C-alpha cells in the first residue's frame, strides 16, 4: 500500500499552481472562480473574508450563506485548470455549522452533478471520499475495508487551519490530512480530465486558503 502511494506521487511534476486570496477584494467572489451547487437549497454565496491567522493572510475564501438544508452542496470551481491526473490540496478552517462543518476538494468536475470529492468533517471527525454521479452522492470505500465503509475516522480540529490533499492517477486515489496518508481508494467512473474546486455542505462556514493544483 505504501509503495503504491509513493509511486503515484512520483508520477507528478514538482511545479504546482497555488491560488491564494491575500490580494483579493473583500466581500466579492475572486476572479477565475465559478459558483455552482449540487441539489437544493439557498444559492451559494462564496466571497472573500478577513482572517489574519490564514496561511497567506489577510484574506481567505468562504461560503457564507448559512442555509441548513442537509443535502445542499455549494461548489466553487477553479476555471483556469483542467487536469486528469495530479494532486489538489487546500488549507481550510472549520469555523461554524450546526448541521455540518465540512471542507472538500473536487476533481474531474464535469458539471454540478458529476465529479469526485473528498471531504473532512469537523462534526463527524472523519474523512470520506465520494463520487457524485448524475446528482447522486455515493461513498467510495477505502482500500482494504468493506465496500460499504464510510471513509476513515480522524480528528478534524475546529477553528484552526488544517490541510486536505488528494492525489489521483487513473482510477487510483490517495487521501492525506495534515501531511499524513489516511487511505487509498479506486474508482473509474470519471476517467476524463476535468476541473477542480472546493465544496462545502449545508450550513458549514469554512475558510479556505492556498488552493494548490498540479498535474496534467
Short names for language-model regions:
Residues 3-13:
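Sec-dependent N-terminal signal peptides
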Residues 16-39, 209:
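Extracellular carbohydrate-recognition regions
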Residues 19-20, 190-216:
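Ligand-recognition surfaces built from glycine- and aromatic
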Residues 26, 63-137:
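Secretory/extracellular carbohydrate-interaction modules
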Residues 28-62, 71:
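Extracellular glycan-recognition surfaces and repeat-rich motifs
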Residues 135-165:
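Short, aromatic/His-centered strand-loop micro-motif at the edge of beta-sheets
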Residues 171-197:
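Short, solvent-exposed beta-strand-to-loop segments that form ligand-recognition rims
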Amino acid at each position: 500500500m505504501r509503495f503504491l502511494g509513493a509511486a503515484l506521487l512520483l508520477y507528478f511534476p514538482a511545479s504546482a499552481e497555488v491560488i491564494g486570496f491575500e490580494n483579493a477584494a473583500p466581500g466579492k467572489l475572486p476572479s477565475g472562480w465559478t459558483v455552482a451547487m449540487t441539489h437544493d437549497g439557498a444559492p451559494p454565496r462564496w466571497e472573500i473574508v478577513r482572517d489574519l491567522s490564514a496561511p497567506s493572510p489577510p484574506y481567505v475564501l468562504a461560503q457564507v450563506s448559512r442555509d441548513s438544508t442537509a443535502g445542499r452542496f455549494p461548489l466553487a470551481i477553479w476555471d483556469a485548470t483542467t487536469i486528469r491526473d495530479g494532486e489538489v490540496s487546500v488549507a481550510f478552517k472549520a469555523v461554524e455549522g450546526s448541521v455540518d462543518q465540512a471542507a472538500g476538494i473536487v476533481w474531474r468536475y464535469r458539471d454540478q452533478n458529476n465529479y469526485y470529492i473528498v471531504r473532512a468533517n469537523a462534526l463527524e471527525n472523519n474523512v470520506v471520499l465520494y463520487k457524485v454521479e448524475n446528482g447522486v452522492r455515493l461513498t467510495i470505500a477505502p482500500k482494504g475495508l468493506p465496500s460499504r465503509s464510510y471513509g476513515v475516522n480522524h480528528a478534524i480540529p475546529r477553528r484552526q487551519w488544517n490541510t486536505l490533499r488528494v492525489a489521483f492517477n487513473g482510477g487510483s486515489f490517495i487521501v492525506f490530512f495534515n501531511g499524513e496518508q489516511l487511505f487509498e481508494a479506486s474508482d473509474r467512473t470519471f476517467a476524463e480530465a476535468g476541473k477542480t474546486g472546493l465544496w462545502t455542505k449545508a450550513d458549514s462556514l469554512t475558510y479556505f486558503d492556498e488552493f494548490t493544483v498540479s498535474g496534467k
